[in-house]
Amino acid sequence: MEPSSKKLTGRLMLAVGGAVLGSLQFGYNTGVINAPQKVIEEFYNQTWVHRYGESILPTTLTTLWSLSVAIFSVGGMIGSFSVGLFVNRFGRRNSMLMMNLLAFVSAVLMGFSKLGKSFEMLILGRFIIGVYCGLTTGFVPMYVGEVSPTALRGALGTLHQLGIVVGILIAQVFGLDSIMGNKDLWPLLLSIIFIPALLQCIVLPFCPESPRFLLINRNEENRAKSVLKKLRGTADVTHDLQEMKEESRQMMREKKVTILELFRSPAYRQPILIAVVLQLSQQLSGINAVFYYSTSIFEKAGVQQPVYATIGSGIVNTAFTVVSLFVVERAGRRTLHLIGLAGMAGCAILMTIALALLEQLPWMSYLSIVAIFGFVAFFEVGPGPIPWFIVAELFSQGPRPAAIAVAGFSNWTSNFIVGMCFQYVEQLCGPYVFIIFTVLLVLFFIFTYFKVPETKGRTFDEIASGFRQGGASQSDKTPEELFHPLGADSQV
């Protein structure tokens, strides 16, 4: 591997930084709706009274609020499934740039919903920003993976998740009643998303297009070479160009890859299964359930302002994403994912014990707080960041957009299902709901151990070749045989 491949140049930092502004938007819009729930519900009631001369029924209010929250995921499902329509036609960078129009429209709708006395404007704004975020979850990991050198691909790929958790943390802080989570400023809280959108519109024109897109999709070798020189900070980019040309030759031998082809072809069936299961391991891990439980647990523990403790968990969230950023290229993706899943399973068991004994032993609430922080920390070590960028690593240039669309759709759909069903399952199971997540985490651990290869330090073509060599027979190999061509046996 060339020394230049480990260099973090200014142009590379600008490109990745410009892209992850979209990740920040995703995180912010995920977390922003929770804090101002009561004041927005009051706005819904006032609007209803203004229109119909009577207070809104509690059931209608609950339905409207649930729709306001869930419509974001519906938009995300549609957006994530549409990734391939844009990236191959307009390019990776230009697609990110164009999508900011959705953020501006959403900001206007939500920002003026109170003035217009229209909760429909708010709900439509949530849907539109959901579409934007669904597209972002495909665009950002793809672009970052394609501009990054092999030696830095995992670390820079983790920045997508870091952007998400920082966005959530900002939303939690801005959502405090003393800042913007009050009856006067909540429209600004929801519409402030125009600022990162505007910033991205300013930054992205100075960022290069993906060199892989230029060479492999557009056959513009000179432009790709020029971009690579700027990204790598060196005049000698022969190694990168040769790798891309080899991938391009391989792509020309393959027919156009559709979403159905991903599941039909033996060469793609294994990696798409891995991609989907890793996305499910993120959303079905119970992380959303933990955040759901956290406020009530902090209250039972005697925390005077549970919202500040929730922000504390957001800080833990961010801190351990940074830890993952620094160790992912040393420890490897597979190892960190396994550690994260195992740690989360242990914390889920602790949480179940603590919640079950909370009434008899009040001090158990402190154990549950430790379990919450531990659960969040282990999530950000593996299942949080890794599923996002490993999907881009598992596929060559041809099938990558379709694969990212399928993986993103799986993530958003499972997110939607958990959001809609968790409260009913929790009412049925009580504190024992975490037993369900423990079982799922163990199953995901087993799958990861036997099926997921290590991609650390390997080029896209080497990873794809590993799957092609195995073909349909890979599932019959031992973990050692499966991981060998992909470098899992290399020294940490």
Curated annotation (Swiss-Prot):
GO biological process: cellular hyperosmotic response; cellular response to glucose starvation; cellular response to mechanical stimulus; central nervous system development; cerebral cortex development; D-glucose import; D-glucose import across plasma membrane; D-glucose transmembrane transport
Pathway: Carbohydrate degradation
Result when mutating residue 411 to S: In EIG12; decreased glucose transport
Spans through the membrane: 12-33, 67-87, 91-112, 121-144, 156-176, 186-206, 272-293, 307-328, 335-355, 366-388, 402-422, 430-450
Residues that hold D-glucose according to the record: 282-283, 288, 317, 380
Effect upon mutating residue 485 to L: In GLUT1DS1; creates a dileucine internalization motif that promotes recruitment of clathrin and mislocalization of the protein to endocytic compartments
Keyword annotations of the record: Acetylation, Cataract, Cell membrane, Disease variant, Dystonia, Epilepsy, Glycoprotein, Hereditary hemolytic anemia, Intellectual disability, Membrane, Phosphoprotein, Sugar transport, Transmembrane, Transmembrane helix, Transport
Site, as annotated: Not glycosylated: 411
Residues linked to a glycan: 45
Coiled coil location: none
Modified residues (Phosphothreonine): 478
Reaction it catalyzes: D-glucose(out) = D-glucose(in)
Binding-site residues, cytochalasin B: 137, 282, 388, 411
Impact when changing residue 149 to A: In EIG12; uncertain significance
In-chain residues carrying the UniProt-annotated modification N-acetylmethionine: 1
Places the protein is found: Cell membrane; Melanosome; Photoreceptor inner segment
Signal peptide residue numbers: none
Region (Disordered): 468-492
GO MF terms held by the record: D-glucose transmembrane transporter activity; dehydroascorbic acid transmembrane transporter activity; fucose transmembrane transporter activity; identical protein binding; kinase binding; long-chain fatty acid transmembrane transporter activity; xenobiotic transmembrane transporter activity
Impact noted for substituting residue 286 to D: In SDCHCN; no effect on protein abundance; no effect on localization to the plasma membrane; loss of D-glucose transporter activity; increased cation leakage
Consequence of substituting residue 329 to Q: In GLUT1DS1; stabilizes the inward-open conformation
Cytoplasmic side: 1-11, 88-90, 145-155, 207-271, 329-334, 389-401, 451-492
Outcome (variant: residue 314 to S): In GLUT1DS2; the mutation decreases glucose transport but does not affect cation permeability
The family this protein is said to belong to: Belongs to the major facilitator superfamily. Sugar transporter (TC 2.A.1.1) family. Glucose transporter subfamily.
Role of this protein: Facilitative glucose transporter, which is responsible for constitutive or basal glucose uptake. Has a very broad substrate specificity; can transport a wide range of aldoses including both pentoses and hexoses. Most important energy carrier of the brain: present at the blood-brain barrier and assures the energy-independent, facilitative transport of glucose into the brain. In association with BSG and NXNL1, promotes retinal cone survival by increasing glucose uptake into photoreceptors. Required for mesendoderm differentiation.
Protein name as it appears in the record: Solute carrier family 2, facilitated glucose transporter member 1
Higher taxonomy: Eukaryota, Metazoa, Chordata, Craniata, Vertebrata
